[in-house]
């Protein structure tokens, strides 16, 4: 893994994986897509889609743990605060050899700079929420979200996915 390459690719993901519009039906389709992918691969995880106003999708699959919802909340809080993916935040901090507490005064109990939460962006509006996965290694959490977004938006996942 090359941090600079990953950060460039995540910036491309965040630029291309944006919606023309996003409503509750779109949230359902995204959530069901993520759940299908996770179930087919037998991935024990939690899936959450939350807009700034309310939670609009939640699913826990076999293998998820009681800690996963807290990880979802903390990663989602990071997206809501910084308007970029939690994985990009974590990699940027790793590159700077710091953390959220030291750099921004954000408590670990409330924020997590670990992969798996991705901003829901509506073109011309900005970030309106976050889609989050927790339960896998952080890179895999991030990759699953990106794959589902690419499928739903008709984007070329091969051009967007992180290098192995």
From Swiss-Prot:
InterPro entries in the cross-refs: PduO/GlcC-like (IPR005624), PduO/GlcC-like_sf (IPR038084), YBR137W-like (IPR010371)
A Pfam family this chain is assigned to: HbpS-like
UniProt cross-references to Gene3D superfamilies, sorted A to Z: Haem-degrading domain (3.30.450.150)
Lineage: superkingdom: Bacteria
Similarity annotation: Belongs to the UPF0303 family.
Record-linked PANTHER family: PTHR28255, UPF0303 PROTEIN YBR137W
NCBIfam families listed in its UniProt record: PRK02487.1-5
Listed name of the protein: UPF0303 protein Smed_2872
Species of provenance: Sinorhizobium medicae (strain WSM419)
């Amino acid at each position: 893994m090359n941090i600079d390459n990953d950060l460039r690719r995540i910036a491309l993901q965040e630029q291309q994986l944006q919606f023309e519009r996003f409503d509750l039906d779109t949230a359902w389709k995204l959530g069901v897509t993520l759940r299908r992918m996770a179930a087919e691969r037998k991935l024990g995880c939690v899936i959450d889609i939350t807009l700034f106003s309310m939670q609009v999708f939640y699913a826990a699959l076999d293998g998820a743990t009681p800690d996963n919802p807290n990880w979802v909340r903390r990663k989602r809080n990071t997206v809501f605060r910084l308007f970029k993916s939690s994985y990009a935040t974590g990699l940027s901090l790793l590159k700077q050899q710091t953390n959220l507490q030291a750099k921004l005064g954000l408590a670990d109990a409330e924020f997590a700079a670990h992969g798996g939460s991705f901003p829901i962006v509506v073109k011309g509006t900005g970030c309106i929420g976050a889609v989050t996965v927790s339960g896998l290694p952080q890179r895999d959490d991030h990759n699953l979200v990106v794959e589902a977004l690419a499928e739903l938006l008709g984007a070329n996942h091969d051009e967007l996915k992180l290098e192995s």
